[in-house]
Amino acid sequence: YVIPDKKYEIGKVTVKTLRSTDAGVAFLVKTCGKTIYHAGDLHNWKMEHVGELINGKMERDYRHQIRKLEGEHINVAFVVLDPRLGEYTDLGLAYFMKNVEADYVFPMHMWQDYSAIEKYKQKCDNHLYTDRIMDIEKENQVFDMDNLK
């Protein structure tokens, strides 16, 4: 088991954990000269039915954790884009894209509704962000990282 806000070194692998806004932790993994970020359940889980007090705390907590990634060059990131959140689906992804340098971003937690990716790309007018977001079409899709742009 791992706990939030810790650094673990296992051989040539370094793992830093961030506190989730839901369950578990997010991971920043460095190995073989590459950096991989996996958000887990770290997201700005804004919801209509919970009120501004809880939503405000959620947003502050999310931003606080993401600020810990500033200055990191991330090669591959897995970031939440959950269509169950309706109009708030992309709040976490949008903040991540504006504040973290990541070469390739794979949206996740989409519950097989991959249309949220294209909706975000159409909504976002900054191609520096949208060009880094990978289009996912199906569950368990395989990407050949050696042949990406």
Predicted ranges, named:
Residues 1-73, 138-149:
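Core dinuclear metal-dependent hydrolase active-site scaffold
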Residues 1-7, 89-149:
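Binuclear metal-ion centers of metallo-dependent hydrolases, dominated by the metallo-beta-lactamase
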Residues 23-26, 39, 77, 94, ...:
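A sequence-composition feature that detects small, non-aromatic residues
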Residues 23-25, 44-48, 83-89, 108-118:
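Active-site environment of divalent metal-dependent phosphoester hydrolases
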Residues 37-41, 57, 76-84, 104-111, ...:
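Active-site neighborhood of phospho(di)ester-bond hydrolases with catalytic His/Asp-centered motifs
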Residues 61-67, 86-95:
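A short, acidic, amphipathic alpha-helical segment used as a generic capping/interface helix at domain edges
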